[in-house]
Design a protein with these regions (language model features):
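N-terminal intrinsically disordered, low-complexity, charge/repeat-rich segments that act as generic
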Residues: 1-77
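Non-DNA-binding regulatory cores of transcription-related proteins
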Residues: 80-138
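Conserved hydrophobic positions within beta-strands
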Residues: 136, 146-150
């Protein structure tokens, strides 16, 4: 097993990535607004349909709300709290992957180790929730052995 990466380092990296995602969505919203207004059109004057700037802005706004809500989930995690079971804020090391319970993410690399963010809404989380070190969980024909939790 690899060495334990400090939970505070994992959380800090996740917060940074989430902020970058929020910044990206904010910039995209501004770009779409600027493009619509530069074409002398307000969003409601553009063509109807799924490609209209108004609908696109609405979709972007919903996605921005979602990533902001995820940021609040991350901010609610206290890295000083040790975890003995799979729960929000836990780092869960399995025989397949290492997960950080909070929000879903593609994965971050710290000190050569890849850590995947897992949402409490993820199907795998519902199978792992409450389990302890040494327990095993089967999900989607894959057996996960929990090697460490902290």
């Amino acid at each position: 097993m690899n060495h334990r990466i400090a939970k505070s380092t994992i959380l800090s990296t996740c917060l940074q990535k989430q902020q970058e995602l929020i910044d990206h969505f904010n910039q995209r919203v501004e770009d779409v607004k600027a493009e619509a207004y530069n074409n002398n059109e307000t969003p409601s004057q553009t063509d109807e349909g799924s490609n209209s700037p108004e609908e696109f802005l609405q979709t972007l706004g919903q996605e921005l709300d979602f990533v902001r809500a995820e940021m609040e989930v991350l901010r609610s995690i206290d890295p000083a709290n040790p975890a003995n079971v799979v729960e929000r804020g836990a780092v869960v090391v399995t025989n397949h992957r290492t997960f950080f319970i909070g929000v879903s993410s593609e994965g971050i690399e710290i000190d050569g180790q890849k850590i995947f963010g897992m949402s409490e809404h993820a199907p795998l989380y519902s199978h792992m929730k409450g389990h302890r070190k040494g327990d095993s969980v089967e999900y989607n024909k894959t057996r996960y052995v929990i090697e460490d939790i902290y």
